[in-house]
Amino acid sequence: MAEITAKLVKELREKSGAGVMDAKKALVETDGDMDKAVELLREKGMAKAAKKADRVAAEGLTGVYVHGNVAAVVEVNAETDFVAKNAQFVELVNATAKVIAEGKPANNDEALALVMPSGETLAEAYVNATATIGEKISFRRFALIEKADEQHFGAYQHNGGRIGVISVVEGGDDALAKQVSMHIAAMKPTVLSYTELDAQFIKDELAQLNHAIELDNESRAMVDKPALPFLKYGSKAQLSDDVITAAEADIKAELAAEGKPEKIWDKIIPGKMDRFMLDNTKVDQAYTLLAQVYIMDDSKTVEAYLDSVNAKAIAFARFEVGEGIEKKANDFESEVAATMAAALNN
């Protein structure tokens, strides 16, 4: 039997990332053969990862990396927020964003096949991380955005890395692009422009807005407040030329009824049309970047502000950890609590 020295254990730990006891056991089982011990730990790690495969990993971090004219934003999940702050986990997230920005995979399968600087694939890195960290660690998704030489990336992470954003802005500078990304992080747009919204989605959202107005009007009636008008339109996509022409005609009729002289109508109509557009694009304001009120200048929309500084938003990607993941009631933290309770009762 070979002597298992502290030096051997340390070397194996450095190669595998395993804990002290796991490394020592592997060396004992392989009679001190370093290569066999590494392989044994790898196999045990795969087994541990398989056992954790059905767990829900909804915590974690985003990673953002810019590589020349290519930028990547990724989401990596863990089971608990505690592990998401682990140095090994953070390093894995950052390495994932870097290798994806450099490798430009087309999908998750291609991403997981990318080779890390350590020589292992990304998939193997996640198996090993699950084994050494002790929780299910999973690579969830990524987005790649490319830009032209004259354009600017805005890379931004918020809330300790739970939100990651990449934006591309034409004109301006990197600082402006970062400000746009800060807006995106805060206001949660899902698309750039109203042209990307599905017609049925707009109708459904408009119905929800009018339902909210209906409920509000019931409350207002109880205190003798006037009812709010229902919305006829929710998006610029619904405002055809005929709708715009009719709105202008209604404004002119209103001004005439009020006795306003026609010579001043040209000064009044633009402001009223702006109000009409604002009132009838509520869905756009909720979901499209360009229609949102800019957080850095609330007198303008994002589109209007960028236009005022000769810039234009081209594209963006925003990830927030855990969005769309349904957590099971019996998650990892609950399992730990249940295990501790059982131990105390025995």
From Swiss-Prot:
InterPro entries on file: EF-Ts_dimer_sf, Transl_elong_EFTs/EF1B, Transl_elong_EFTs/EF1B_dimer, Transl_elong_Ts_CS, UBA-like_sf
Molecular-function GO term, any one: translation elongation factor activity
Localization per record: Cytoplasm
Record's keyword annotation contains Lipoprotein: no
A Pfam family the protein falls into: EF_TS
Keyword Cytoplasm appears in the UniProt entry: yes
Coiled-coil region: none
GO cellular component term of the entry, any: cytoplasm
Keywords annotated in UniProt: Cytoplasm, Elongation factor, Protein biosynthesis
Region (Involved in Mg(2+) ion dislocation from EF-Tu): 80-83
Protein task: Associates with the EF-Tu.GDP complex and induces the exchange of GDP to GTP. It remains bound to the aminoacyl-tRNA.EF-Tu.GTP complex up to the GTP hydrolysis stage on the ribosome.
Family, per entry: Belongs to the EF-Ts family.
PANTHER family assigned: ELONGATION FACTOR TS, ELONGATION FACTOR TS, MITOCHONDRIAL
Protein name: Elongation factor Ts
